[in-house]
């Protein structure tokens, strides 16, 4: 990818963004450090424990109950999932349930549409981190990205990243790939990385489309080893997870986590 474009994205002065031409798939050069997807997938799929360690055990249904959240946390402890991912209203419950277990709590912000004010996003992030959340999954301002307002996209992601990183938390940025063109996926991913994203995430699961191996490979090709790639949305089987890991994902978000891990063997 043209380094002049990257320099413009990454500088503190954001005005050059307006003059940057759209990023196309043909611009990709795999020169950001190697991520060996094949080796990572082979290691991760070597056993149920290794697979569980890269899965965000997720419950984001609007009608989720306390009992279901507590069950999610019990499963996260038993299977040693990467984290338990919940809606903000259940963050305190999850933090209490997972205290002292070594399993972190994740929660969503600006979810599921990415259409909140930056001030609201900051407040959500700060409140959740105070509760003990250690992984934040936000949704990129999709409409701003599609409108070409790259300053707003960068500012929004950077605001959340600064809060997360100040407290040692991770930030995953959902692009909602089902709603984006190839150029928008690449542009959104590049902006998110340079604004501080620790992971690019494919989907919220609420926009009519989920993770595909093609989108994961596209994001990994653009990101290289600069950040993680989280595949989420519609992942229900071990075959789904395998295809996405082999395409370049190093984190999976799923509500069918237990069933996926059990397909690989007993824990």
Residue ranges of each PLM-predicted region?
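Short hydrophobic "strand-cap" motifs at the C-terminus of beta-strands
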Residues: 232
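Charged, compositionally biased N-terminal leader segments and the immediate start
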Residues: 1-55
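Alpha/beta enzyme core
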Residues: 40-79, 83, 89-96, 100-229, ...
């Amino acid at each position: 990818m043209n380094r002049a474009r990257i320099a413009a994205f990454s500088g503190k002065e954001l005005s050059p963004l307006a003059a940057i031409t759209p990023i196309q798939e043909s611009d990709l050069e795999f020169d950001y450090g190697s991520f060996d997807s094949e080796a990572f997938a082979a290691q991760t799929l070597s056993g149920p424990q290794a697979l569980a360690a890269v899965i965000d055990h997720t419950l984001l249904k609007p009608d989720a109950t306390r009992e279901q959240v507590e069950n999610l946390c019990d499963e996260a402890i038993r299977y040693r999932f990467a984290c338990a991912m919940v809606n903000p209203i259940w963050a305190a419950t999850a933090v209490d349930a997972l205290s002292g277990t070594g399993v972190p709590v994740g929660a969503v912000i600006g979810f599921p549409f990415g259409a909140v004010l930056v001030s609201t996003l900051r407040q959500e992030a700060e409140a959740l981190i105070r509760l003990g959340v250690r992984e934040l999954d936000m949704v990129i301002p999709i409409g701003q990205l599609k409108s070409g307002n790259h300053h707003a996209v960068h500012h929004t992601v950077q605001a959340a990243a600064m809060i997360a990183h100040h407290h040692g938390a991770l930030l995953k940025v959902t692009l909602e790939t089902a709603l984006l063109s190839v150029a928008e996926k690449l542009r959104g991913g590049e902006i998110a990385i340079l604004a501080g994203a620790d992971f690019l995430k494919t989907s919220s699961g609420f926009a009519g489309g989920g993770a595909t191996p093609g989108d994961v490979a596209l994001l990994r090709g653009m990101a290289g080893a600069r950040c993680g790639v989280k595949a989420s949305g519609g992942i229900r089987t071990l075959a789904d997870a395998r295809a996405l890991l082999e395409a370049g994902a190093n984190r999976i978000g799923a509500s069918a986590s237990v069933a996926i891990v059990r397909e690989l063997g007993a824990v």
